[in-house]
């Protein structure tokens, strides 16, 4: 028996739900990240459209794409934002100033400033940065969807 005041609704687990807070527009920041070798833009569009359907169609929700400014999935995520006329928040890694720690530092900043992650790893190639992003997103209790 559901004793909460919120009614149970059927929910597609591939769709992220949002709530309206006292009639105020909510900004929903979603990181789109993945392998630098990821190049399947059609698949990305189909998956992101399905996952973000409720938010993209809700006039009270402003979706913002968070990008790590890398090649591959990150760049395609920015292209997705452009296609949907969404704002992009860019977090470039400071490779010159931070060296090898630049990627993890950037990933932590993104995880601290987002609500969700849609990750596109490619197995069979190096995915350390993507796996680090997934781990950090989970540590910060972001909604995480990993697309294989």
Regions found by a protein language model. Name each.
Residues 24-27, 37-148:
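Acidic/glycine-enriched connector segments
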């Amino acid at each position: 028996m559901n004793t909460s005041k919120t009614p149970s609704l059927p929910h597609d687990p591939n769709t992220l739900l949002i709530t309206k807070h006292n009639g105020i527009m909510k900004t929903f920041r979603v990181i789109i990240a993945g392998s630098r070798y990821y190049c399947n833009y059609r698949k990305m569009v189909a998956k992101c459209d399905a996952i973000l359907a409720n938010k993209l169609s809700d006039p009270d929700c402003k979706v913002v794409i968070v990008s790590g400014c890398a090649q591959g999935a990150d760049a395609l995520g920015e292209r997705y934002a452009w296609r949907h006329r969404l704002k992009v928040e860019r977090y470039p890694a400071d490779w010159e100033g931070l060296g090898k720690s630049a990627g993890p530092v950037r990933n932590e900043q993104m995880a601290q400033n987002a609500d969700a992650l849609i990750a596109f790893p490619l197995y069979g190639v190096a995915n350390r940065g993507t796996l680090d992003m997934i781990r950090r997103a989970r540590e910060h209790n972001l909604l995480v969807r990993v697309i294989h």
